[in-house]
């Protein structure tokens, strides 16, 4: 298999009960891309993975089947299985520090308090991987963060959340076609 231009991995929790939650926005972005690119995701170890082409670039899409806080196991496993250079990985996550409707793409960085990203960094042994954060807002009472991230967007938030997911999909495609700098210039 030729080396892909990008393997985009959307973090979230497995199971229908989490499908439409804020915490699963990474999965939702991958679902949108798989539909747009007609890429079917197949079970492989502890992830769903699919491969296809965008323009003239090979692109991979994946969603871990592990819970968010154990996402690093799946990400590290995929990287090892496909012998991918770290700069070919893009991890997509929810971010409660960003307003609903916004995205932020970075080539490296901290976990920002996100347990899924922290576990990915731990298992990869580095923070030098690209990440795409999709804003979910933080409109919750003190001590209710878990309830907030594990609930769906409100009716008022849905249009902005949908727009952010579409922007995130476009950012992934821009990164696959061009590079992360082009995607950051367009979407940050």
Curated annotation (Swiss-Prot):
<dbReference type="GO" id="GO:0006515">
    <property type="term" value="P:protein quality control for misfolded or incompletely synthesized proteins"/>
</dbReference>
<feature type="active site" description="Proton acceptor">
    <location>
        <position position="23"/>
    </location>
</feature>
<dbReference type="InterPro" id="IPR036416">
    <property type="entry name" value="Pept_tRNA_hydro_sf"/>
</dbReference>
<keyword id="KW-0694">RNA-binding</keyword>
<feature type="binding site">
    <location>
        <position position="115"/>
    </location>
    <ligand>
        <name>tRNA</name>
    </ligand>
</feature>
<dbReference type="GO" id="GO:0004045">
    <property type="term" value="F:peptidyl-tRNA hydrolase activity"/>
</dbReference>
<feature type="binding site">
    <location>
        <position position="69"/>
    </location>
    <ligand>
        <name>tRNA</name>
    </ligand>
</feature>
<keyword id="KW-0820">tRNA-binding</keyword>
<dbReference type="InterPro" id="IPR001328">
    <property type="entry name" value="Pept_tRNA_hydro"/>
</dbReference>
<dbReference type="Pfam" id="PF01195">
    <property type="entry name" value="Pept_tRNA_hydro"/>
</dbReference>
<keyword id="KW-0963">Cytoplasm</keyword>
<dbReference type="GO" id="GO:0000049">
    <property type="term" value="F:tRNA binding"/>
</dbReference>
<comment type="similarity">
    <text>Belongs to the PTH family.</text>
</comment>
<comment type="function">
    <text>Catalyzes the release of premature peptidyl moieties from peptidyl-tRNA molecules trapped in stalled 50S ribosomal subunits, and thus maintains levels of free tRNAs and 50S ribosomes.</text>
</comment>
<keyword id="KW-0378">Hydrolase</keyword>
<feature type="binding site">
    <location>
        <position position="18"/>
    </location>
    <ligand>
        <name>tRNA</name>
    </ligand>
</feature>
<feature type="binding site">
    <location>
        <position position="67"/>
    </location>
    <ligand>
        <name>tRNA</name>
    </ligand>
</feature>
<dbReference type="GO" id="GO:0072344">
    <property type="term" value="P:rescue of stalled ribosome"/>
</dbReference>
<dbReference type="GO" id="GO:0005737">
    <property type="term" value="C:cytoplasm"/>
</dbReference>
<protein>
    <recommendedName>
        <fullName>Peptidyl-tRNA hydrolase</fullName>
        <ecNumber>3.1.1.29</ecNumber>
    </recommendedName>
</protein>
<dbReference type="InterPro" id="IPR018171">
    <property type="entry name" value="Pept_tRNA_hydro_CS"/>
</dbReference>
<comment type="function">
    <text>Hydrolyzes ribosome-free peptidyl-tRNAs (with 1 or more amino acids incorporated), which drop off the ribosome during protein synthesis, or as a result of ribosome stalling.</text>
</comment>
<comment type="subunit">
    <text>Monomer.</text>
</comment>
<feature type="site" description="Discriminates between blocked and unblocked aminoacyl-tRNA">
    <location>
        <position position="13"/>
    </location>
</feature>
<feature type="site" description="Stabilizes the basic form of H active site to accept a proton">
    <location>
        <position position="94"/>
    </location>
</feature>
